[in-house]
Amino acid sequence: EWVPLPGSLEAIALLNQAGYQIAIATNQSGLSRGYFTIDDLHAMHSKMERLLQPLGGKIDSIFFCPHTDAHACDCRKPAPGLMKEIALRYKKTNSNQPLLGVPIVGDSLRDLEAGIALGASPHLVLTGKGQKTMAKGNLPDGTQIHADLMAFTSTLLKTQA
């Protein structure tokens, strides 16, 4: 069952209220492995949306890869396929780096690599797998590190003010 990290829903709502659109790109190999069904995944997404609504937040789009590493797909992060789909959805198709300057926030190197392939600005959060990711090193140049999604949001909104 999906449980939100403390402060994450509030951070998303603050981003929405500041005019940001939120897109999620997620690897969901559990679908291919039979750990859960597409209906289960949609139920998790619906729960997220339901919990965000009273806070004034929303997820604008969710893109997921159902494949395992064994599949030779372009959508499983760190491949940039999901990010390309996001760029197309938001009509950012005018260059080889359609997400130039757009923040990519994640807790894994895979997340960051998928975004920087299209020019996104990498932001590592230390929740989830973030601590292990930071300890391994090899973060992309320019990666900013934040305690959690709320810390990222606070930093972003301060720099935009």
Where are these regions (language model features)?
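Short, acidic loop-to-helix structural element flanking the phosphoryl-transfer center
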Residues: 1-25, 31-46, 74-84
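Acidic beta-strand-to-loop metal/phosphate-binding motif
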Residues: 25-27, 104-105
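Short linear capping/connector segments at secondary-structure termini
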Residues: 27-31, 64-70
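A generic short-segment signal for beta-strand/edge and adjacent turn/coil regions
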Residues: 30-33, 113-115
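Asp-based, Mg2+/Mn2+-dependent phosphohydrolase catalytic module
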Residues: 38-60, 69-104, 108-161
